[in-house]
UniProtKB/Swiss-Prot annotation:
Enzyme class: ligase
Species lineage: Bacteria, Pseudomonadati, Pseudomonadota, Alphaproteobacteria, Acetobacterales
Protein name: tRNA(Ile)-lysidine synthase
Substrates-to-products reaction catalysed: cytidine(34) in tRNA(Ile2) + L-lysine + ATP = lysidine(34) in tRNA(Ile2) + AMP + diphosphate + H(+)
Membrane-crossing residue ranges in chain numbering: none
Top-level lineage group: Bacteria
GO biological process per UniProt: tRNA modification
Organism this protein belongs to: Gluconobacter oxydans (strain 621H)
UniProt similarity note: Belongs to the tRNA(Ile)-lysidine synthase family.
GO molecular function terms noted in the UniProt entry: ATP binding; tRNA(Ile)-lysidine synthase activity
Matching Pfam families: ATP_bind_3
Length: 398
């Protein structure tokens, strides 16, 4: 585990989180993690997708207790049908991140194994992915406020099951893991040993290429791009290319994924426009280039104003005293009292900044500089909290 570190001390206030479904792989992870350190906490997610899921989740919590592993049950709210596996995965990680933060976990261990890696790479190979996709699942990545660590990526699932059998530890078999309606299940059942070996070669070659490309991109962004704490970016004309636009659009939007390549190429041909909730426009007084700002129409809805609340998936409100019933939403027309030229903030970017509203009136604006709000409103501390980097997501993957 040392190579995945650094790790916090093994104390009550800094446990390491475990994502445990109750299946063989995650139960093996829990067993091994508990042998590694005393302070771990398992999070068991009930997706509520099957009638028996609640009972299975409770059984898993009981089994973890028998392994001397502290466990918390997380039950997801119902979500719309369609793209069920994708929606369930997204909702699961949202719940896991929030649970980790509440328990003081900086790291969450996830039980992806060698077979998962093979299937992921082969699936992306079939869909003609480039180095970004073919580099596969990374052993360490960052999601929001936590690290996701996958220490079992080089271990076959058969070895994990043998570990459980040797310790007389039971697990749950999820019937959806055998449902051939899902592409991943078909690959899991149909991939030959030769194809799995080819997938591993593809993954290693793509990983090296991805690292090289990311290093080049980071150098180019360092030379031509400027990130501003108000959530917008200036990109000099010499730095405008497909890769730079793609990662910067993702950065400004806070999206988990880059926009589609074809859409980025179309945007480059136009020279300006909107994509993935981001406006790309000429920089004007800010220099020779373009600026990228959040698209106002794409902003998230108001959320209750409380310490730690995240609005639009990007801005987190720190501790502050607000009236009961206050909400976090965009500044919008409230920016009329601001001297945007003096503050150096584009009009479109300022409208999309967060503020605290109460009964239709802005009571707290973001802290932008001396006398930004005058007597119009107080100030609140918002921090950028999307957890989406421009580059470097894969710097743990060597």
């Amino acid at each position: 585990m040392a190579r995945f570190g650094p790790w916090p001390p093994d104390i009550d206030d800094a446990p390491v989180g475990l994502a445990v479904s109750g299946g063989a792989d995650s139960m093996a992870l829990a067993f091994l993690a508990r042998r590694w350190r005393r302070n771990v906490v398992a999070f068991v997610v009930d997706h509520a997708l099957r009638p028996e899921s609640a009972a299975e989740a409770q059984l898993t919590v009981h089994r973890l207790a028998g392994m001397n592993v502290k466990a918390r049950l997380l039950t997801l709210a119902p979500f719309p049908k369609g793209r069920m596996q994708e929606r369930a995965r997204h909702a699961r990680f949202e719940a896991l991140e929030a649970a980790c933060v509440s328990e003081g976990c900086l790291d969450l261990l996830v039980a992806h194994h060698a077979g998962d890696q093979d299937e992921t790479v082969w699936m992306r190979h079939l869909h003609a992915s480039g180095p970004l996709g073919l580099s596969g699942i990374q052993p360490v990545s960052v999601r929001g406020r936590i690290r996701l660590v996958r220490p079992l990526l080089t271990f076959p699932t058969a070895r994990l099951r043998l570990t459980l059998q040797a310790e007389n530890l039971p697990w749950i078999e999820d019937p959806s893991n055998a449902n051939r309606r899902f592409e991943r299940v078909r690959l899991r059942q149909d991939l030959t040993p030769e194809q799995r070996q080819e997938a591993r070669v593809l993954q290693q070659d793509a990983l090296q290429e991805r690292l090289r490309l990311e290093a080049e991109l980071a150098e180019e962004l360092g030379r031509h791009a400027v990130w501003y704490s108000q959530g917008w970016v200036f990109l000099g004309q010499e730095g405008v290319d497909e890769e730079a636009l793609s990662v910067l659009i993702r950065l400004v939007s806070g999206s988990a994924y880059r926009p589609a390549r074809e859409a980025v190429r179309t945007l480059m041909t136009q020279g300006y426009g909107t994509l993935s909730g981001v406006q790309v426009r000429p920089a004007g007084r800010f220099g020779n280039g373009i600026i990228l700002v959040r698209e106002e129409r794409a902003l998230g809805p108001f959320v209750p104003a409380k310490a730690g609340a995240v609005w639009d998936g990007r801005w987190r409100l720190l501790a502050c005293d607000v009236p009961q019933g206050s909400l976090i939403g965009s500044l919008g027309d409230a920016i009329h009292v601001m001297d945007l030229r003096r503050l150096g903030v584009p009009y479109a970017a300022a409208r999309c900044l967060p503020g605290v509203w109460h009964e239709g009136r802005l009571v707290l604006g973001p802290r932008l500089g001396e006398r930004a709000w005058g007597e119009f409103a107080g100030e609140a501390d918002f921090v950028w909290s999307s957890g989406v980097p421009a580059t470097g997501e894969n710097h743990f993957g060597t």
